[in-house]
Amino acid sequence: MRLIKIIILLLLVIGCKKKKVTESTSTVNTHLKNGMMVLCEGLFQQNNASISWVDFSNSAIDNQFFTTKTGRLLGDTGNDMQPYGCKIYIIVNVSSTVEVLDKSSGNSIKQISMMNNGIAKQPRSIAFYGSNAFVSCFDGYIDVIDTTSLEVIKRIKVGLNPEGLTVANSKLYVANSGGLNSPKMDSTVSVINLTSLEEYKKITVGKNPGAILSDNQGDVYVISRGNYSTISSKMVKINSVNDEVSAIFSEEISGIEKMESNLLVTYKSNANSVRKVGVFDVVNEVISVPELIKGTNFTTLYGVQYRSSNQKIYCFDAMNYTNTGFVKVFSSSGILETSYHVGLNPSKIVFYE
């Protein structure tokens, strides 16, 4: 009788262990909320791009979020991450893939291979319009991806090594950097008609254009990064009605982010100063708040992202590009409130309410 009781107890213990495995598996499908997904680029050719999940309710951080969800690595050099509809699209440059995740759960939907006859296209950035996603590829094309089938349906020839993308007035603006062709860099922005899906114009904006965005008035701003030595970076404004350059700003601006009706800019006051974050007034075309966030808050200021729902500014600190980085959160008046220790070279955030 005692032996039978022991056997029954063992069976109960085994049964409980199986339940725990099932419960653990079910957490993979938990709906994500009240947090942020952070893309960390990793280091070039080290295959260590990653995604961090930060839970705002308890400040818990999972720096292996993508691997936990998929059972594999994200890849080499994650350059962009954007939500659209019920999906999140992640651009992995050196691996030449676009990872598509279910936004609600973070689970993988599809990995899109970005190869052309065995040659890497090297995707860089992504933007959306209607039922299509547009991916800039370093081989000189914009790939059009159907957001339902998740297949590449067209390639549009543009300039050298296209990078940043933005949509304004039913047109796609493409910053052609030519960064891989130094010293013979590109200096143009391609304009693509989003009805015909054809390039119809190139606008000269200055050497090595990279980041680009449109404001609430429909004007387009692009950063021409120069040659990193004798030619400094600058910001150029494009009128999206006539597609002509309407203003060039003298400040050494290297980064831009939309903040309500104005822009956040990262810039240097002079060649010897550290980069800081200011506010650019798009109506009066001046930096109205020269030092909203001091550069001394960072080891390596890598970028800025604004969250309109709470009016907070999220700054990326890359920590000299070799140590795992931080997302530092500031109030709209520039006060540091908190920071989160994430992966290597954080650069993009998708927020969850």
Per-range role (PLM):
Residues 17-353:
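Predominantly soluble domains enriched in secretory-pathway, periplasmic, or organellar proteins
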Residues 2-9:
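Sec-dependent signal peptide recognition
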Residues 12-15:
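C-terminal motif of bacterial Sec signal peptides marking the signal peptidase cleavage site
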